[in-house]
């Protein structure tokens, strides 16, 4: 049974973008196969959100820089006595290969942008009730096509995200595992510390505390205020133990 709740908070814009992309790609696979109108709207809304995120920044450039940075960090670890050099070399090779695939891939999201069905649905999503069958007969007929045909088309769409998804997963896994959790204590519901050029805060709280963190800050300094889920009757203990990793 789950006894701890994990919260993550980005400390810079690139990490904020990466976490949003990770979340949206995960959401694309939640309700597969797409078998009805509700499932289709969930899928296409996440596709539209993903394309919006892609258009706001240089996702590929930032990710390629991070792949190179992680390779340099691993190179430094090779010199440390007692480390698993084979494991480090395997990781470096995987990062290098992911970068090569990403840099040679088409523009991120371009395959999805050029798809007629995605474009039609995307145009209607901002209109309340704009995806009714009379607004989008194309979607209506698509939902009545054989399930195998829809599955194959969705698989093709998701495959176009594979170079990005693989590189992003590698980077985020390395960042998340770069620092262990350490026990910390807040006083009167408040905690602050130096970020030490961190990209990501990871925080674990006991589920039974029914508290959540409000986090503010950047890579050099951050502050956490703990809030009760029940804003009227909930209490925050004077001293609260929690686990924190500045990655």
UniProtKB/Swiss-Prot annotation:
Quaternary structure, from the entry: Interacts with FtsZ.
UniProt function note: Cell division factor that enhances FtsZ-ring assembly. Directly interacts with FtsZ and promotes bundling of FtsZ protofilaments, with a reduction in FtsZ GTPase activity.
Family: Belongs to the ZapD family.
Protein name (record): Cell division protein ZapD
Main location: cytoplasm
Record carries keyword Cytoplasm: yes
GO BP field: division septum assembly; FtsZ-dependent cytokinesis
InterPro entries: ZapD, ZapD_C, ZapD_sf
One Gene Ontology cellular component annotation held by this UniProt entry: cytoplasm
Record keywords, A-Z: Cell cycle, Cell division, Cytoplasm, Septation
Compartments, as annotated in UniProt: Cytoplasm
């Amino acid at each position: 049974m789950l006894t701890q709740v994990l919260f993550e908070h980005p400390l810079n814009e690139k990490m904020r973008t990466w976490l949003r992309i990770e979340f949206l790609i995960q959401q694309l696979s939640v309700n597969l196969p797409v078998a009805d109108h509700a499932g289709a709207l969930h899928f296409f809304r996440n596709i539209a959100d993903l394309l919006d995120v892609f258009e706001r920044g240089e996702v590929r450039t930032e990710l390629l820089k991070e792949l190179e940075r992680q390779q340099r960090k691993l190179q430094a670890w090779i010199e440390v006595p007692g480390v698993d050099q084979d494991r480090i070399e395997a990781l470096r090779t995987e990062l290098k290969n992911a970068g090569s695939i990403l840099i040679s891939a088409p523009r991120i999201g371009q395959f999805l942008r050029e798809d007629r069905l995605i474009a039609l649905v995307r145009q209607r999503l901002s209109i309340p009730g704009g995806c009714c069958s009379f607004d989008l007969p194309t979607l209506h007929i698509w939902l009545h096509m054989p399930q195998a045909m829809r599955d194959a088309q969705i698989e093709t769409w998701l495959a176009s995200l594979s170079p990005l998804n693989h590189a992003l997963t590698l980077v985020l896994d390395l960042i998340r595992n770069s620092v262990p959790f350490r026990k910390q204590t807040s006083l009167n519901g408040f905690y602050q510390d130096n970020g030490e050029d961190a990209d990501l805060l990871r925080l674990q709280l006991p589920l039974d505390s029914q508290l959540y963190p409000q986090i503010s800050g950047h890579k050099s300094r951050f502050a956490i205020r703990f809030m009760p889920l029940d804003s009227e009757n909930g209490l925050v203990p004077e001293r609260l133990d929690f686990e924190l990793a500045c990655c």
